[in-house]
Amino acid sequence: MEPRFYKIPVCVGDVSLRVAKGHFATRNSHTNYFVDVTNQQSCIREAEAAAQQLAQRNLSQHMMVDTILCMDGTRVIGTCLAQKMTQGGFRSINAGREIYVLRENVGSNGQLIFRDNARFMLEGKNILLLLASVTTGSTVRRGIQCVQYYQGKVAGIAAIYS
C-alpha cells in the first residue's frame, strides 16, 4: 500500500512539506512520519523559497560563510542559498563575497571525501552544513568530522526539516 501524503505549509512563503504517516525505517532510526523534500531539492521555485526562508532565519546576518557543504541532495537549495546570502540588497555580512557550493562525496567506506581540486573550498574556511532533514544527528556528525578532517570550521548547520 502506497503512503498517503499530506501537504503542510512551512512558516511563510510558498514552501510546503509533503508528509506521510506510517512506520518508516532509515539506516539510523525508525520514524512515524516520512517527510518528502524532493520538490525542495529539485524544483528551482521551491528551492529558492526554501533558501529564502533559511537566509532570513539569521543565517545571512550573523554568520560568515565561505562554503556551503550540501548533503542529502541539497545542492540546488545550496546554490540558491549562496545567491541569497551574497546579494547586496539583502542584510548580510556575506554580501558581495564569494561562497563556494560543494556537494558531498561518499567513499566506499561511507566517509565523506573530496578530491584535491576541491580541498581549497574546505581548508581554513567557514563552512555551513546544509541538510535535507535531521533526525538522529548521525549525518550531521559525519559532516562535522569531514569538515574537521579537512581543517575547516563549522560555521553552522541548516536543515529544511528537523
What are these regions (language model features)?
Residues 6, 28, 33, 100, ...:
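Sequence-level detector for tyrosine residue identity
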Residues 40-119:
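Conserved PRPP/pyrophosphate-binding segment of the phosphoribosyltransferase/PRPP-pathway fold
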Residues 23-25, 33-38, 50, 71, ...:
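Long, contiguous hydrophobic alpha-helical segments, chiefly transmembrane helices and signal peptides
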Residues 28, 66, 124-126:
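Nucleotide donor/acceptor-binding cores
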Residues 1-64:
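Active-site-facing substrate-recognition patch
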Residues 92, 105-162:
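PRPP/pyrophosphate-binding module of the type I phosphoribosyltransferase fold
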Residues 3-8, 98-101, 126, 130-132:
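N-terminal start-of-chain detector that recognizes signal peptides
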